[in-house]
Amino acid sequence: MADFYYLPGSSPCRSVIMTAKAVGVELNKKLLNLQAGEHLKPEFLKINPQHTIPTLVDNGFALWESRAIQVYLVEKYGKTDSLYPKCPKKRAVINQRLYFDMGTLYQSFANYYYPQVFAKAPADPEAFKKIESAFEFLNTFLEGQEYAAGDSLTVADIALVASVSTFEVAGFEISKYANVNKWYENAKKVTPGWEENWAGCLEFKKYFE
């Protein structure tokens, strides 16, 4: 069983948990207390010198960056390739959505909310505009689409639903974006591990209360 270093509230960690559920892989979950500096201990730095979560250790093979872990789990353990198809064009669209999630959507969350939550900084209106812009892009991607990349659930949906649900508990109005809202309501029903994802979201919500 693969060791999985994580925090339940972390969106990237939740995307891996849902992907593991989708491919039927059990994870040996190991909570990492970042506030206590457990990620900076020599034994963890030996596993992941970047000292980030999530981190997976599968039979001695260490990997971090949630979207890389998602793809690895599907390629190694998926009974089919439906979550990450081998077709170059289908895979390219999924990759684009994953990179969009990492570099644009979730990045906008971090840039706007993290300074407020962790540094008690005032809200930055310019950073909020970046969130709105990211959601407008996602709304356009989802025009006429039930899923984020193609016509069935993929790792792109799983990564994006982890991010979008985090925006929801932060109080962002997802309903303003009709295509995103419709996709999100469907994703809640069809994504394996949604319940655990939402429990993690509610844990993260405490930072906003």
Swiss-Prot record:
EC number of this enzyme: 2.5.1.18, 4.5.1.1
PROSITE patterns documented for this protein: GST_CTER (PS50405), GST_NTER (PS50404)
Every GST N-terminal domain range: 1-81
Domain spans labelled GST C-terminal: 87-209
Binding site for glutathione: 10, 51-53, 65-67
Catalytic activity: RX + glutathione = an S-substituted glutathione + a halide anion + H(+); 1,1,1-trichloro-2,2-bis(4-chlorophenyl)ethane = 1,1-dichloro-2,2-bis(4-chlorophenyl)ethylene + chloride + H(+)
Keywords: Lyase, Transferase
BP-aspect Gene Ontology terms: glutathione metabolic process
GO molecular function annotations of the record: DDT-dehydrochlorinase activity; glutathione peroxidase activity; glutathione transferase activity
Assembly, per entry: Homodimer.
Main function: Conjugation of reduced glutathione to a wide number of exogenous and endogenous hydrophobic electrophiles. Has DDT dehydrochlorinase activity.
Family affiliation: Belongs to the GST superfamily. Theta family.
Name of the molecule in the record: Glutathione S-transferase 1-1
Organism field: Drosophila simulans (Fruit fly)
